């Protein structure tokens, strides 16, 4: 009976003369083993006390958002990373911003900046909500920045929040990895689910004291996705990908229930997922959001050529009231609108991509993965 009860701990830990030595990240396995025999000695309390919303947050959190914020503070104090996996629409952005306002409270010592990596379509929304709900300073890291790789703190050190996109992270990882951030936050963290992708390899190069992943997709649904997310959040929890494949993926696929439960116990303390039906049934099923899209480089070149052509028509006949001239102008405006959607609407030989189309596909994939 004793062996059966503590078998998982024996497999995960190292036996010493006085007991079993385990990594702090194996807290979930310890929690499960002690739950019945020594509930008073649990390393993680099941009921986390609510932390007061910090000064500077200009929003009233719903009860479940208060719990989510308090859960993140609890992990922060223990030195752990986490994955907030609430359904879309439950306010993962606000909960995260509340955590960051808590960390950067005026009475706290000066901390390094936090890097928030987001899909391009969500960049505007994050900046807008950060300005609206917090008193934190912020900047966007983009292609216009000239940052000294040897002294990145000269730029990053002036702000609390640094926003950037996954594309910028991939293309400028040499700069971003030269600075040790307080937090690295990945929104729509499904972007790193492919461990062979450049996005994943770039994300795990980032340096920080703490890491947080935000997703509306249940990461437990795919074991390889689960490993990739946790290799970013808490690299020492699930080991290397090959070891994880051997220790967990293969046995679980063969129907080994004990191993499946063991994996669930290991990861449970670091994942918080609530459904809309569970915590906020009063929220409307349909929400409307305006998403701003940037044109791709090739698309923008076509757009600028058409715009210059239209400008020349206007400059050549500035006072013309000729109906044919007016038609040419209206047709030019229509062509600009079509180019902003996708150049192939008027240029059959165009082989590039479109910012809007890419965003529609990305948003559809997100909605589909979230049910």
Positions of PLM-derived features:
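Charged, low-complexity intrinsically disordered regions
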Residues: 1-43, 110-111, 226
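ASCE P-loop NTPase motor core, strongest for the SF2 helicase catalytic module
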Residues: 31-257, 264-371
